[in-house]
């Protein structure tokens, strides 16, 4: 059954994931994603840099259903995603799944520099609207050195326009996607792993 609880307090709502540097986080659990949200509503995932993952960079949605779910108005914009899906397959820089209501957007993301793993028996994608994905506007995403720009698998109603290697505003997207200048120092932090 699609996840759409009558108690709306159970739904992850209005979360913001912004200005994060997420790099090399899938070493132990290769099927993990840089950022993953199962059934969010009104989530904002923006201005992040996600890189060096063994599977998908950003994943939003679950359930493989065209029926109404708790998801609506999800925003995945202005992210810089590169060197992802390095070992596994059937993933993407940005992967979305199932009916996501209305008003969801995937815009002005810069997806670049990755290829299908030599161990994979199936491809990977820049943007992947998987089974029953609906409710999205997918526009102005720049994809450079990407084996497949956009894949759509049994999707519902979406608006997909002006994406690829030269969408309108490509130079601006390249310059502004990812971590905003006021948070750039996050990439210089050194974190010492705990010793077990």
Language-model segments: what does each one mean?
Residues 1-8, 28-37, 54-66, 88-98, ...:
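Extracellular beta-strand/beta-solenoid scaffold signature
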Residues 1-3, 7-26, 41-55, 68-85, ...:
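Right-handed parallel beta-helix
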Residues 8, 18, 118, 132, ...:
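Context-gated lysine
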Residues 33-36, 59, 63, 103-105, ...:
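Compositionally biased, intrinsically disordered low-complexity regions
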Residues 60, 116-118, 147-150:
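Noncatalytic linker/hinge segments flanking ATPase motor cores
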Residues 62, 131, 152-154:
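A cross-domain feature marking catalytic cores of carbohydrate-active enzymes
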Residues 104, 145-146, 150-196:
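Acidic, glycine- and Ser/Thr-rich low-complexity intrinsically disordered tracts
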């Amino acid at each position: 059954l699609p996840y759409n609880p009558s108690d709306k307090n159970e739904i992850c709502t209005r979360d913001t994931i912004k200005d994060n540097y997420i790099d090399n986080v899938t070493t132990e659990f290769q099927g993990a994603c840089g950022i993953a949200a199962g059934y969010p509503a009104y989530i904002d995932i923006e201005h992040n840099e996600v890189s060096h993952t063994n599977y998908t960079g950003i994943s939003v949605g679950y359930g493989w259903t065209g029926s109404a779910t708790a998801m609506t108005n999800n925003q995945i914009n202005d992210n810089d995603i590169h060197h992802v899906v390095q070992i596994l397959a059937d993933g993407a820089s940005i992967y979305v799944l199932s009916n996501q209501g209305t008003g969801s957007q995937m815009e002005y993301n810069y997806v670049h520099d990755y290829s299908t793993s030599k161990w994979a028996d199936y491809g990977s994608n820049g943007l992947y609207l998987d089974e029953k994905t609906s409710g999205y506007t997918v526009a102005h995403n720049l994809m450079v050195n990407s084996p497949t720009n956009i894949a759509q698998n049994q999707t519902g109603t979406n608006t997909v326009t002006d994406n690829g290697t030269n969408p309108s505003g490509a130079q601006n997207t390249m310059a502004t996607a990812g971590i905003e200048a006021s948070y750039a120092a996050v990439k210089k932090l050194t974190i010492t792993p705990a010793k077990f």
